[in-house]
């Protein structure tokens, strides 16, 4: 089938909820923030949770519902991971924006337009500790005229003095049912055909990240047209074919290092990312049948975790996959080895 005509707008933006009440699967957060919008007086806020669950969407929706399109640009400052947010930026750009007072007479019909500004710091957990400490003083000094919205995946990376000054909102991972409903809505709007198997595959490979699922869907549509299959989605997602990972695990179960080494050579030759191999191998091991004991699973998973850390640190992928293969063989053969 010929590819369907597509606009240049990313579907992530096209189908981003414009109001807080439209955010999916975050009922408690939506209920509290809806009450906040009615009073038009919000505290500093900290949104945390897995990626693709609606944190940024919620922050933007609050700002738009408070100020409307006309005042939004002058009242809201957005900074994300692509911006320099070191200590110098906190002391200059953020402080300068926070310090400017706003009058209550600048109102837009239909919007509360409270007399404060909002600074949205996306991926705040990537800010240095020095920058966060500098930001604490800015929050204290200009709290009457500026509200801060922090967005992060890991709340543990936000220093306590900042976190304690914010109302915290935890965003739950999206269930497969919620993701499926949203994906089907987009398919209906775009005239796409997506069968049950493809829908299940999309939910699985996106791992609860709705933003990622929508991106995969749009990419598959551009490449393969309006009828999308599971294979199409696997091709655009970068997921390693299951048979490739199964072959590696089967080779390790054989106890023959030469066979396992050959499978590692094939994986490297095909250019599959080692980190993705590790993730999928973990799932296979965790779901393995009763011929593998819990202790063997624990040893293999520990090795996979250590390998994943080394890959993040820049270790050679070929050597790390060989280490995984040999360690898995040892664990499955119950050879004495210190893991």
From Swiss-Prot:
ATP-binding listed as a keyword: yes
Any one Gene Ontology BP term: DNA replication
Record note on quaternary structure: Heterotetramer of subunits RFC2, RFC3, RFC4 and RFC5 that can form a complex with RFC1.
InterPro entries (alphabetical): AAA+_ATPase, ATPase_AAA_core, DNA_pol3_clamp-load_cplx_C, DNA_Rep/Repair_Clamp_Loader, P-loop_NTPase, Rep_factorC_C, RFC_lid
SMART domains: AAA (SM00382)
UniProt entry tagged with the keyword Lipoprotein: no
Keywords from the UniProt entry: ATP-binding, DNA replication, DNA-binding, Nucleotide-binding, Nucleus
GO molecular function, one term: ATP hydrolysis activity
Protein name: Replication factor C subunit 4
Taxonomic path: Eukaryota, Viridiplantae, Streptophyta, Embryophyta, Tracheophyta
PANTHER family per the UniProt record, alphabetical: REPLICATION FACTOR C / DNA POLYMERASE III GAMMA-TAU SUBUNIT, REPLICATION FACTOR C SUBUNIT 4
Gene3D superfamilies xref list: 1.10.8.60, 1.20.272.10, P-loop containing nucleotide triphosphate hydrolases
GO cellular component term, pick one: nucleus
Species assigned in the record: Arabidopsis thaliana
Main location, first listed in the record: nucleus
Coiled-coil regions listed in the entry: none
Family: Belongs to the activator 1 small subunits family.
Compartmental location: Nucleus
Residues bound to ATP: 49-56
Role: May be involved in DNA replication and thus regulate cell proliferation.
